[in-house]
Curated annotation (Swiss-Prot):
A Pfam entry, by short name: DUF5454
InterPro entries: DUF5454
Top-rank taxon: Bacteria
Name used for this protein in its record: Uncharacterized protein MG210.1 homolog
Lineage of the species this protein comes from: Bacteria, Bacillati, Mycoplasmatota, Mycoplasmoidales, Mycoplasmoidaceae
């Protein structure tokens, strides 16, 4: 205890954690506990509180997690346990979903903007948070009123890295510099599924929820 003054806040935190829990500090265990027990837990404030050493430790965890996720994903593909056609469609549909949300949020169509605004008002009256309302519009599963930790599971850079990983595994550059999905189910190399010609997602599927919230979709 005599050396307390010479130790950083992060070192003292780790010692206290070890003493109280009788085991070494583990980021995954700690974050899961905090996110489940304290909905207002802010990892950025936590890192700022305990300084550069804490930040370095957390960034090390992020790098390892990203490498682990990429490694598992790559092994599954090489082992043939991931259906390539399904993976292609999921990537395409997720891009369509993102485009839909951006278009809806920043629409230049006056009618669409009015509908969107009314949709949020009615969703709010029904007890939905803005996050839950947006998740409903794009068909993401969630439990109403719960803390949606899945929204904070990955950083922007991690998501972009995973997108690049999928591109490298599934896409090939064509002569016109456009990326196409490599179609392993076809014998001919000239056959491929173009990203720009991806199967379209019927707008009614997503707009249904928008109209229901806006009061245009029925009695509920």
């Amino acid at each position: 205890m005599n050396n307390t003054k010479n130790k950083s806040d992060w070192q003292l935190f780790l010692e206290d954690y070890r003493f109280y829990h009788e085991k070494e500090f583990d980021w995954i265990t700690y974050l899961n506990h905090c996110l489940n027990s304290y909905p207002d837990f802010d990892i950025l404030k936590f890192i700022r509180k305990y300084g550069p050493e804490c930040e370095k430790s957390f960034l090390s965890l992020q790098s390892k997690t990203k490498a682990d996720v990429y490694g598992v994903f790559t092994k599954q593909i090489k082992a043939g346990s991931v259906n390539e056609v399904l993976a292609q469609k999921l990537v395409q549909l997720d891009a369509l979903r993102t485009n839909y949300l951006i278009g809806a949020l920043y629409s230049t169509n006056k009618t669409q903007k009015k509908l969107f605004k009314q949709s949020w008002k009615n969703a709010k009256k029904q007890g939905y948070t803005k996050q839950e309302w947006l998740m409903t519009l794009v068909g993401l599963p969630f439990e109403k009123g719960e803390y949606h930790k899945q929204l904070y599971a990955h950083s922007r850079q991690e998501i972009l890295d995973l997108v690049e990983a999928v591109k490298k595994l599934y896409l090939r550059p064509e002569k016109d510099d456009k990326l196409e999905f490599a179609d392993s189910s076809k014998v001919s190399e000239s056959k491929s599924i173009k990203v720009t010609n991806a199967v379209t997602l019927p707008s009614d599927d997503l707009d249904k929820e928008l109209f229901e919230f806006s009061g245009e979709g029925g009695d509920e």
